[in-house]
Design a protein with these regions (language model features):
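Conserved ABC ATPase "signature" region
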Residues: 60-75
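H-loop/switch region of ABC-family ATPase nucleotide-binding domains
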Residues: 140-141
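ABC ATPase nucleotide-binding domains
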Residues: 171, 178-221
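Catalytic Walker B motif of ABC-type/P-loop ATPase nucleotide-binding domains
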Residues: 104-108
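H-loop (His-switch) and adjacent beta-strand-loop-beta switch element
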Residues: 153-165
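Conserved ABC ATPase signature
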Residues: 79-83, 87
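Conserved catalytic motifs of ABC-family nucleotide-binding domains
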Residues: 100
């Protein structure tokens, strides 16, 4: 905590402006954002359908399609105040994906969700990665998920300590100083869920062949 993860997400989306340096985005880049916290006046009546239109004008069919894509179709008329933690997060995913983003920024997307809900939401992230062309920047402090479900890791501690493939990062001196040998040895047993392996230079080997790898990108801060 306090390493700059959420600040990085907000700088990426433009929610915050840098006080020094600069952030460059491709012109016309569409960004979907699932914040760590969303401030809502819970005393006001608010349906999921209405929440989906607070930041843009979308048709009923667009809203229905976005909710369907994240497994939340039945919630479109539900009161936001009555949603479980996992249901609310799915709605936030739908709210982010309705813009058909080029880049999806997820800031601790499973915070406040129970274990089974976490598993389901990480499966949803994997589904989005595999079925859309969106790049994904996921902010997380869960090292097991970071190492098992990513292509590129960026490790922050007030600055960029190290970056690269999971296998390269967990061997880096900066990572070992930050988390210790015990963490590195524990994480060494993780199983990557892709049907390929990453070389340290980012090249991918699958079924005995090396090829360039691009499924929209998937990075962790």
């Amino acid at each position: 905590n306090g390493s700059g993860k959420s600040t990085t997400a907000k700088l990426t989306t433009g929610v915050l402006k840098p006080t020094t340096g600069s952030v460059t985005r491709k012109p016309g880049l569409r960004i979907g954002y699932v914040p760590q916290k969303l401030t809502i006046d819970w005393t006001l009546p608010l349906t999921v359908e209405r929440l989906m239109t607070l930041t843009g004008r979308y048709s009923a069919s667009e809203i229905a399609a976005a909710l369907e894509a994240v497994g939340a179709a039945r919630l479109h008329k539900a009161a936001v105040q009555e949603l479980s933690g996992g249901e609310f997060q799915r709605v936030l995913f739908a709210r982010a994906m309705i813009r058909k983003p080029d880049l999806l920024v997820l800031d601790e997307p499973v915070q406040g969700v129970d274990f089974s809900g976490e598993v389901a939401l990480y499966e949803l992230v994997r589904q989005i990665r595999d079925t859309t062309q969106s790049g994904i920047l996921m902010i997380s402090h869960d090292l097991h998920v970071v190492m098992a479900e990513t292509d590129t890791v960026i490790c922050l501690n007030g600055h960029v300590c190290c970056r690269g493939t999971p296998s390269a990062v967990k061997r880096s001196p900066e990572y070992l100083r930050l988390f210790g040998e015990r963490a590195a040895s524990t994480l060494a047993i993780y199983q990557h869920h892709h049907d390929h392996e990453h070389h340290d230079d980012g090249c991918v080997v699958a079924e005995g062949h090396a090829h360039e790898h691009d499924h929209g990108g998937h990075s962790h801060g």
